[in-house]
């Protein structure tokens, strides 16, 4: 019997499943082409990418930036960089919107969730929310414990 997944594990699985909901539609089943990426951004990230959501040129620019091997499609590894950047930007936004007070507090992020305190101390970075280039070219292999493509709610 498997242990119940933690909230973070469930969230990671949700990201993978949503990627696959869009990646299987057109082209290669495990990559996002431009049309699939645009649909994913518009439907799944409406609050995080409000400005870019309705601007096709901005969506195309984000995709080009993420497409590190310049094959006009996004692998999961390329796509997850967007998730990481949005997570960092939302965390910074939570610090910027936190009510003044002692300790390490969080206000609403771009998704309007999160409030309260967390266990860390210190002041937040006052960096920008630019989703531009950060650390391209760092590939990895699944090494036998990545996700499989059989039996997880998508067919090939």
UniProtKB/Swiss-Prot annotation:
UniProt modified residues of type Pros-methylhistidine: 106
Function: S100A9 is a calcium- and zinc-binding protein which plays a prominent role in the regulation of inflammatory processes and immune response. It can induce neutrophil chemotaxis, adhesion, can increase the bactericidal activity of neutrophils by promoting phagocytosis via activation of SYK, PI3K/AKT, and ERK1/2 and can induce degranulation of neutrophils by a MAPK-dependent mechanism. Predominantly found as calprotectin (S100A8/A9) which has a wide plethora of intra- and extracellular functions.
Gly residues composition-biased segments: 108-119
Gene from which this protein is expressed: S100A9
Entry binding sites for Ca(2+) 1: 23, 26, 28, 31, 36
Entry PTM: Phosphorylated. Phosphorylation inhibits activation of tubulin polymerization.
InterPro entries assigned: EF-hand-dom_pair, EF_hand_dom, S100/CaBP7/8-like_CS, S100_Ca-bd_sub
Binding site for Zn(2+): 20, 30, 91, 95
Protein name: Protein S100-A9
UniProt KW keywords: Antimicrobial, Antioxidant, Apoptosis, Autophagy, Calcium, Cell membrane, Chemotaxis, Cytoplasm, Cytoskeleton, Immunity, Inflammatory response, Innate immunity, Membrane, Metal-binding, Methylation, Phosphoprotein, Repeat, Secreted, Zinc
Keyword Signal attributed: no
Residue ranges, annotated region (Disordered): 94-156
Entry's Gene Ontology molecular function annotations: antioxidant activity; calcium ion binding; calcium-dependent protein binding
Amino-acid positions noted as binding Ca(2+) 2 in the UniProt annotation, renumbered to this chain: 67, 69, 71, 73, 78
Pfam families: S_100
Assembly mode: Homodimer. Preferentially exists as a heterodimer or heterotetramer with S100A8 known as calprotectin (S100A8/A9). S100A9 interacts with ATP2A2. S100A9 interacts with AGER, and with the heterodimeric complex formed by TLR4 and LY96 in the presence of calcium and/or zinc ions. S100A9 binds quinoline-3-carboxamides in the presence of calcium and/or zinc ions. S100A9 interacts with amyloid-beta protein 40. Calprotectin (S100A8/9) interacts with CEACAM3 and tubulin filaments in a calcium-dependent manner.
Chain intervals with Basic residues compositional bias: 135-156
Record-annotated EF-hand domain positions: 16-51, 54-89
UniProt-annotated location(s): Secreted; Cytoplasm; Cytoplasm, Cytoskeleton; Cell membrane
């Amino acid at each position: 019997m498997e242990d119940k997944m933690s909230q973070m594990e469930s969230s990671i699985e949700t990201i993978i499943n949503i990627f696959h909901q869009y990646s299987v539609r057109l082209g290669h089943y495990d990559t996002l082409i431009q049309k699939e990426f645009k649909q994913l951004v518009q439907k799944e990230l409406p609050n995080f990418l409000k400005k870019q959501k309705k601007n096709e040129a901005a969506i195309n620019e984000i995709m080009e930036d993420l497409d590190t091997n310049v094959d006009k499609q996004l692998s999961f590894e390329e796509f997850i960089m967007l998730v990481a950047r949005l997570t960092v930007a939302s965390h910074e936004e939570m610090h910027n919107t936190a009510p003044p007070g002692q300790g390490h507090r969080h206000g609403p992020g771009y998704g309007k969730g999160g409030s309260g305190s967390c266990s860390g101390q210190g002041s937040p970075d006052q960096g920008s929310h630019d989703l531009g280039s950060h650390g391209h070219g760092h590939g990895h292999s699944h090494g036998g414990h990545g996700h499989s493509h059989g039996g997880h709610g998508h067919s090939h």
